[in-house]
Structure formats: C-alpha cells, structure tokens
Amino acid sequence: KAEGFPVRAVYEYVMTLLNSNYEDWRKANPTASSDDFKFSCKKLNPAGALFDYAKLCDVSKNEIARLDAAEVYDLALEYAKEFDPDFAAALESDPEYARSILAIGRGGKKPRKDLTTWKDVRPYMAFFYDGLFTPGEFPAQFDGAVVRGILEKFLQTYDPADDAAVWFDKVKALTAEAGFCADMKAYKADPAA
C-alpha cells in the first residue's frame, strides 16, 4: 500500500500469474470485469508463480491509464492523505484544477501511461504547483547555453492551440536546428552521429 500500487492493478497482476491465458483474455476484453474470466486450474503454472516487479509496474500503468481523471484524483488523494499530507492539501485546495491536470492525455485510443503508482502522482503534477515545484538542473552532458537557446526559441513558436503533433514537430525542428537528432530511428541506429 505504501508503494502506491492500485489494489485493482495488484489483483490484475496476480491473475496474470495464476492463469497463463488471463493476459490474452484481458487484451481481448479490456473493459470487462475480471469476474467474467473463466479461471482454470489447468492453466496454473506448474512451476509456481514468480514475482516480476517490471510486470507489476506494467499492469499498474495500464490499470491507471484506464481510469478517468476523477477516479485518478480520488484514488491519488486517498493515498496522499495517508502517505503525503502536503500533497493531499495541494490536491484538496482546488480539486477541479487537480482533475483538469490529471485529464491531460487521458482517454482516447492511446491514453498516457505516465503513472505507475499513486506515489508517482506528486512528481507528475508538481510543476503545476508553486509550493511543490523544484526547478531541475540541465543535464551535465548538454551545454546550458544551448538548452536555454532552444527554450527561448520554443517560447517564440509556442501556440497553445497546437495539437500534439504540431507541438512535437516544432520541438523536433528546434532541436535539429541546434544540432540534435530529430529522428529517433536514426538516433538508435547511430547515437554518435
């Protein structure tokens, strides 16, 4: 509980351990109740279940991604009240504002999967709250003047009406202009280029 995994995610994860066909069933039935799954003793792993933390995290990300902003708010607030009272106070100070933040990228065919546990909600939302935000440092491998230059140019091109694709294309163009690779496939093929 203190780690912040949603109860529902832990249940889903355990089901993937118990029955080898549960994960395929869930993919085919993403909104169905797990009670609809036909559990079979024949599908139990004969070697016994092995704990897989990465799998638990993946299941949890998917479970949280299925929730709407109001559900995420309620469950994150419940967690924060017990384990992070300062963050709980920030959430409660303006619930509609918090829900609107949590609604960013939620829903649709490809919902964002930034949150793995309820513990992740504070750092995810911190930059929206003056009292929680801590400015980061530029990564040491990048020249601060170059990073600042990209950010200044970004401010000149920023348009809040841009959709995600237009916004991302602008970011790629600015970074390419500064000498960075704007194509992930090309970068993976030759990171030194």
Regions found by a protein language model. Name each.
Residues 145-193:
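C-terminal accessory/binding modules appended to enzymatic or scaffolding proteins
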